[in-house]
Structures are given as C-alpha cells and as structure tokens.
Amino acid sequence: MGGKSGGKFAGKRRDSGNRGLFKRRKFCRFTAEKVVEVDYKDVDVLKEFIAENGRIIPARITGTKAHYQRQLGTAIKRARFLALMPYTDLH
C-alpha cells in the first residue's frame, strides 16, 4: 500500500470553482463620496447596508471603514426607533 495517497482520510480534492470569477475590491462608499456624517433620514442609503432579515451587514462584507460603520449603526438604530425603517423583515 505504498504511494502518495495521503493517508487514511485523504479524499479527492474538490475544485472551488472560483477560477473564472474575480473578487471585486471592497471600498468605502462614504469615503468615495466624501460624506461627513451618515444621516438617519436618508433611508435609501441605509437600506443598502441591511440584510433581508433586517440585520446590519458587517463592515468586513461591505468594505465600509470603521468610522462610518459606527455612524451607520447609530443612524440605522435611530431610523428604526423613529419608525422610518423596520426592525425585522416581518414588519
């Protein structure tokens, strides 16, 4: 049983299938647009940073800088409190 099988648990290597696709570079939208402060009244912008289930999408996924991510969280929470946005997708 000699060979380069890799041992008992060595299985077939699976192809990830990402060869043809390229990863789009994340960038901070607020920095690009030179926004000074994220406004809670701008609901259309805030909705882009909320998942379908109503959760705030983390900065590691959206590419938002930490400074603006904190402002974004506060703005979304304010908009929810003032009933400009729903807390969940069920409302």
Curated annotation (Swiss-Prot):
Annotated GO biological process: translation
Molecular function terms, GO-annotated: small ribosomal subunit rRNA binding; structural constituent of ribosome
InterPro entries documented for this protein: Ribosomal_bS18, Ribosomal_bS18_sf
GO cellular component: cytosolic small ribosomal subunit
Record text on subunit structure and interactions: Part of the 30S ribosomal subunit. Forms a tight heterodimer with protein bS6.
Family from the record: Belongs to the bacterial ribosomal protein bS18 family.
Protein name per the record: Small ribosomal subunit protein bS18
Organism: Thiobacillus denitrificans (strain ATCC 25259 / T1)
Lineage: Bacteria, Pseudomonadati, Pseudomonadota, Betaproteobacteria, Nitrosomonadales
Gene this protein is translated from: rpsR
